[in-house]
Amino acid sequence: MIVISNTNIIYSCFYKPEGVIATILKNRKNKLQFIAPSYLLDEIEEHLPQIMKKNQLTKRQAKTLLKEFTKNITFYDLEDIKRENRDKAVKIVKEIDPDDYLFIALHLEKGHKIWTCDFELINGLKRKGTISVLLQEN
């Protein structure tokens, strides 16, 4: 099974580096395959100072953990996703969380479920009834 990892899945790994989510992501023998838009890395970088502060990590430690958590994820650049899917995704999430449009666009492009623990996104997509989501409790 292939799943699209949402950014908050990676965030949760910093707070529980030995937790279920981090263990699943780090397992190379996993039957799950992970994909994500490369925007996920940009979003993590943007919030890295807060992550470092809350978890008492140096920049080097945070970067090492990020590499470990994302080593089994295949990333897709913006250009890898058709414009029509990006445009449709923008419309779907405009009232939920516009920052999540690339995850939705990748879902529209590839057809895989989105793995997330973002309840705002989950509930918003459920109301629209258009996107398959895998809920992950922290």
In which residue ranges do the predicted regions lie?
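PIN-domain endoribonuclease scaffold, especially VapC-family toxins
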Residues: 27-31, 35-87
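A generic structural signal for short hydrophobic patches within well-formed alpha-helices
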Residues: 10, 41, 121-122
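Residue-level signal for well-ordered alpha-helical positions
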Residues: 16-17, 47, 127-128
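Short amphipathic alpha-helical segments and helix-helix/interface helices
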Residues: 21-25, 63-66, 103-104, 122
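Short, well-structured N-terminal submotif of metal-dependent ribonuclease cores
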Residues: 1-36
